[in-house]
């Protein structure tokens, strides 16, 4: 008999049988070896065949293993094994059976039939396990479905639907699918398209995360519950698993063979199956090699003839990129657009999913948490879609509470650390013999006893609370299972089981759950098992860096005294500090316009008066770091062509992939202070970009992504009108000076730009009185640097006044002061430190002598 007439699976099994015989030192390959190999083969057909025929496979395996152990072992043959006469006879019988069935190739299931028609040890074992020729013959007919074995890969194509699809209706029956809330319009539209005579293939298109897959799951649940028109009743929804279809298809044509097997199986089902292809665009080009046909082209004939009932799902971008390019494939599908649900719909969806997440995380999700998840995610996460982002928020909040429940409470942890500390001290004191140590040891023992008693009481309480939570969880799991069983009983019409569950089991479990939950609420001291809006806000704050969590009293106090904090760094600019503080307070109190930035300001004034310093102080106040400020020097954007660097180069230009200078910074940190320094030096086209930011709080970058600026503070600084400020300082009050400066500003900037800014703030020139305070701030930084090297420095009042005089320049503001400190203090100090005149550890005093500042110890 020619071995190339065996199917590829049968050939592999024969090779495995040879390896088995070699490994066991048997001289011949017996039918037992081949049967063992066939039963252990991955993706083989013999094991499923025997199982479907009702044969006891476990017993058969055990008998074969024992028989193999009894076979004679021969050593020193040098790895030479031959097929036994019995195996050759059985294989010839297989050939005869294949010819009788008009098969071109011999498939592995015929081996079972041949063994039963033969006589031998294996025949007796099969019969003992319950196999007969008639039973196996019938099982083979059922499995083949009337097909002939016409090619070597025929066995791989068999049961293709079972191998390469997931039965969603079966999962719906078992209650494994999440409930689908709302989306009635989309499900109805999908059913409507499926009911058509031709082109009855809907494709669900929408943004990622809006619930396209959920709609198909909802359809499967409706079919199971019988809530569909007559034409769709008793149909099955199968989801095509593209991963397993492509995985392992090493040779050319293997993928097409598998897909053909799926399509053949579908055509045999005669319209009783709806095939769901998630990520439909993956079918276009899938399996396409040199001259090979891709999956999309193989689907076209089946779709056109109506043999294939298909539901696709893909995103808008991928539909445009892949499906629309292939007009022949596109016309065979009917589009069903899935829009993002509203916040109200999302709240309803979350309420429906609540029980599943409570069961998974073993927590209780409150209704305010659900409302907060929908509203906060809608407002603060702009680059993702509802309901996906809201579900993720609830999921992660539940996960964080579960983590806290599983770890030791903080109070217990603190006590444990204290006990360890006391025990260490006790061991040390035991070695001492003086009276003071003995007295301390007695006190220590008393404290240790008390702490250990406290610890054991707390631990008992913690364990009791955990046990109570576990009990509640078990009741919830039982209740969920009872509801699923009730649904299954309703479908099959088992009235006795339904009444037992509906009027007996479920009410009893609900009563137990209510009692356990009430008890839980009274007794819980150490553990938290409730997800509230606070946890949801904390998760969102961790994701985005935007502080949306409820303000603690300490933060409220901090916001109320914000001006004092900012004045510690910015001297003398009361109007500017007040304007910025009010904007931040409005935002944190939730009163600011949700569609605009927190605040947008134009700071005007001479150089060196604190415009940039105020931005740094604000960034430090909000984020505890100067680095949280996005600083863009607008003098870099003087040319027209450099404007595109802010939002990123357009498609086709170099640097398109890199994104924009401004947009990327804000996309990564949506909550930040943006400083546009020296804004009047920028090209006028820059202001066209800024109009969108200041008015709508959004900007579209070069790649078409919308960047959210609603949680940023936009500050622009400019020197416009600084000469007028210098000129009229002291002669005019603040409002008059602002009017004069605004005349200059309105000539330089367009009205629509000025109109969108929240406030234009004019900074005053600095007076002599201000410079002494600024000198103190600058010197504090110097003192810190010297402290690190072991020097303690103080300055006398005359020296401070001398510095103020030396650094005063009404034109240049506070910057000359920095130079004065460098020349008068830092330079002499550096020389004295290096020459060894100043000794670390001895205080240093800075004083004035002969018109110079000197350091004395």
From Swiss-Prot:
Region (Repeat 2) residue spans: 83-146
Annotated region described as Linker, given as residue ranges: 341-545
Gene Ontology cellular component list: cytoplasm
Subunit structure: Homohexamer. The oligomerization is ATP-dependent.
PROSITE patterns: CLP_R, CLPAB_1, CLPAB_2
Coiled coil: 404-492
Region NBD2, annotated ranges: 555-765
Keyword Aminoacyl-tRNA synthetase attributed: no
Localization terms from the record: Cytoplasm
Designated name of the protein: Chaperone protein ClpB
